[in-house]
């Protein structure tokens, strides 16, 4: 969307804080149903981020595929599990949990360092100029294919990895 600067910045901060709060809800809610709804909220916030960056097709695909199908599938799977499995006593921290949290924290810190060291101003203008040039030369379906294989390759790969980890976690919970 082509919004004014302060409105665009406010929406980015608002959606970012909603994304962080929703992510914390996914991890911290003791009830898996609430966690699944919080995951749906996070995926909807990601879709709204795509709308703010003028990627309407990617936003629609995000809503239809991840919020509409995958999240509903997760909610159904959680609803069919026994409720008694949610409240079993277990050790809060094991060695694997400590190693996993250490790896996740190091990845998070490296991503924050990379984000802060990147010059985003040039990246944004380069992307907008490429979009203007591509709109004149090729059709919209070809533009979608080019954008999915170039500009939006990393977001789709990251989402697929996150989805894979979530499904492995769901299988591990279902086996117990």
Swiss-Prot record:
The chain crosses the membrane at residues 10-30, 32-52, 61-81, 92-112, 152-172. It is an enzyme of class 7 (translocase). It comes from the Eukaryota. Keywords: Chloroplast, Membrane, NAD, NADP, Plastid, Plastoquinone, Quinone, Thylakoid, Translocase, Transmembrane, Transmembrane helix, Transport. Its main location: plastid. It catalyses: a plastoquinone + NADH + (n+1) H(+)(in) = a plastoquinol + NAD(+) + n H(+)(out); a plastoquinone + NADPH + (n+1) H(+)(in) = a plastoquinol + NADP(+) + n H(+)(out). The keyword Chloroplast applies. It is found in: Plastid, Chloroplast thylakoid membrane. It is a multi-pass membrane protein. Its EC number is 7.1.1.-. GO terms for cellular component: chloroplast thylakoid membrane. GO terms for molecular function: NADH dehydrogenase (ubiquinone) activity; quinone binding. Pfam families: Oxidored_q3. InterPro entries: NAD(P)H-Q_Oxidoreduct_6 (IPR050290), NADH_UbQ/plastoQ_OxRdtase_su6 (IPR001457), Nuo/plastoQ_OxRdtase_6_NuoJ (IPR042106). PANTHER family: NAD(P)H-QUINONE OXIDOREDUCTASE SUBUNIT 6, CHLOROPLASTIC (PTHR48479:SF1). NDH shuttles electrons from NAD(P)H:plastoquinone, via FMN and iron-sulfur (Fe-S) centers, to quinones in the photosynthetic chain and possibly in a chloroplast respiratory chain. The immediate electron acceptor for the enzyme in this species is believed to be plastoquinone. Couples the redox reaction to proton translocation, and thus conserves the redox energy in a proton gradient. NDH is composed of at least 16 different subunits, 5 of which are encoded in the nucleus. Belongs to the complex I subunit 6 family. This is NAD(P)H-quinone oxidoreductase subunit 6, chloroplastic.
